[in-house]
């Protein structure tokens, strides 16, 4: 017996409906299908064309193994929570920073979005709102992107979405806001000398001299300087060992405190020859601590003790305390130098705004001006990427080249 041919079904506009397609009495279109685990799912749309576009995408997802069953309920928050748990290689400080930024700026709004619904334009709009409404600067935006991009990458790898909607967003944001990576500039030799001399001869700021001398004589990071212990300083062989960082960060309970971390890369572990001026500064610091009683301080951080640089209360300096002191010092200096220059009818040697990290950059610049072996510079600085060293070297040698040609004026006969 011949099989009865199925009758055609039409929508309210007379268009033939395909298998699985339906139109309700209220005009809404729907498409019924089974997901990868055999459970019936339904797509809805107000137009047939839109329904068929959704249907085509869903069928493609099913062919490619995209998890259409869960994608309707999984949120950005769900994916981030999975990402941060699986990212076991993150340092505690980095992990806590990511969590802090996510909880404060992403979870409540953007994080509530359904994972599969997030488009490129959604990410761009979110980034733009952080810049305009929250006043985010390039560095903060980089952190947000560093959190979201791998979160969506994990979603792609787990077959929840087809492509990463954060791809290319930061490049467009930087272009539209004319952002360029902030360059850290070194102090000139004149500015460096003026700064150190002012500190050394000041009744108010002279206690900072050993710390700043060590910064400018080693090129260490601020976490390496404040974490330096007496046992890391070999005065017999004139060697300083850098093997850990001391960081001050917010913990999961919301409180802030000091913690020890190991360098992120092997290049961070290194030994630095102790310059005579640095040795003198460190011995002066020890003498001052013995005098005021802080040398025998028992402050312990994660099992580490015997820290070199302590304030008058015997406590470790916080990075923000050092940077605040730098600002106070150069502002006081600039004020006095401006008045003195007016009296002497000369141009003042003013010190620009800078932070503790600029002292590291200043040391590296002086080093580059006097050393041609890039590999040695990289090892002393603890740069994991030699391109970082090369960029500073190029900037330093370019300035030296300009100075050399200025000195040639009138000394070379051309015609």
Positions of predicted regions on the chain:
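Catalytic-site neighborhood detector that most strongly recognizes the C-terminal catalytic loop/helix
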Residues: 246-248, 362, 381-407
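C-terminal catalytic core of Y-nucleophile DNA break-rejoin enzymes
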Residues: 43, 47, 239-241, 250-251, ...
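Basic/aromatic DNA-contact patch characteristic of tyrosine site-specific recombinases
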Residues: 1-74, 78-81, 85, 100, ...
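C-terminal secondary-structure termini that scaffold catalytic or DNA-interacting sites
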Residues: 1, 237, 248-269, 276-278, ...
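N-terminal core-binding DNA-recognition domain of tyrosine site-specific recombinases/integrases
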Residues: 35, 42-43, 47, 72, ...
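Basic, Lys/Arg- and aromatic-enriched nucleic-acid-binding interface segment
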Residues: 138, 142-146, 157, 161-163, ...
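Short, basic (Lys/Arg/His-rich) helix/loop patches that form interaction surfaces
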Residues: 197-208, 218, 272, 288-298, ...
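Short, polar N-cap/turn motifs at the start of nucleic acid-interacting alpha helices
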Residues: 232-239, 372-392
């Amino acid at each position: 017996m011949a099989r009865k041919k199925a009758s055609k079904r039409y929508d309210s506009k007379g268009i033939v409906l395909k298998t699985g397609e339906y139109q309700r009495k209220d005009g809404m279109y729907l498409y019924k299908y089974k997901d990868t685990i055999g459970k019936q799912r339904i797509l809805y749309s107000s137009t047939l064309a839109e329904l068929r576009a959704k249907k085509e995408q869903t069928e493609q997802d099913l062919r490619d193994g995209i998890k259409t069953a869960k994608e309707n309920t999984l949120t950005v928050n769900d994916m981030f929570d999975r990402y941060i748990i699986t990212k076991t290689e993150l340092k505690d400080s980095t992990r806590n920073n990511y969590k802090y930024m996510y909880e404060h700026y992403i979870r409540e709004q953007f994080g509530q979005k359904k994972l599969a619904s997030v488009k490129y334009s959604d990410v761009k709009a979110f980034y733009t709102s952080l810049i305009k409404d929250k006043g985010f600067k390039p560095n903060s935006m980089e952190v947000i992107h560093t959190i979201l991009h791998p979160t969506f990458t994990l979603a792609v790898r787990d077959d929840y979405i087809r492509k990463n909607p954060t791809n290319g967003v930061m490049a467009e944001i930087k272009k539209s806001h004319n952002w360029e990576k902030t360059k850290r500039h070194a102090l000139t030799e004149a500015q460096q000398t003026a700064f150190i001399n002012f500190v050394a001869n000041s009744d108010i700021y002279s206690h900072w001299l050993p710390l700043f001398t060590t910064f400018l004589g080693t090129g260490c990071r601020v976490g390496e300087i404040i974490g330096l212990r007496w046992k890391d300083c070999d005065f017999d062989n004139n060697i300083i060992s850098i093997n850990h960082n001391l960081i001050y960060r917010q913990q999961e309970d919301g409180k802030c405190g000091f913690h020890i971390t190991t360098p992120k890369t092997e290049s961070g572990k290194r030994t630095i020859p102790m310059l005579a001026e640095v040795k003198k500064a460190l011995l002066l610091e020890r003498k001052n601590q013995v005098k005021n009683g802080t040398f025998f301080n028992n402050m312990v951080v994660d099992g580490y003790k015997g820290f070199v640089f302590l304030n008058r209360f015997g406590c470790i300096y916080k990075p923000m305390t050092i940077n605040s002191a730098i600002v106070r010092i150069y502002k006081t200096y600039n004020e006095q130098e401006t008045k003195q220059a007016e009296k002497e009818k000369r141009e003042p040697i003013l010190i620009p705004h800078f932070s503790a990290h600029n002292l590291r950059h200043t040391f590296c610049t002086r080093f580059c001006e006097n050393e041609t072996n890039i590999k040695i510079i990289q090892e002393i600085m603890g740069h994991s990427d030699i391109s970082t060293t090369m960029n500073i070297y190029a900037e330093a040698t370019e300035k030296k080249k300009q100075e050399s040609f200025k000195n040639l004026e009138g000394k070379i006969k051309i015609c």
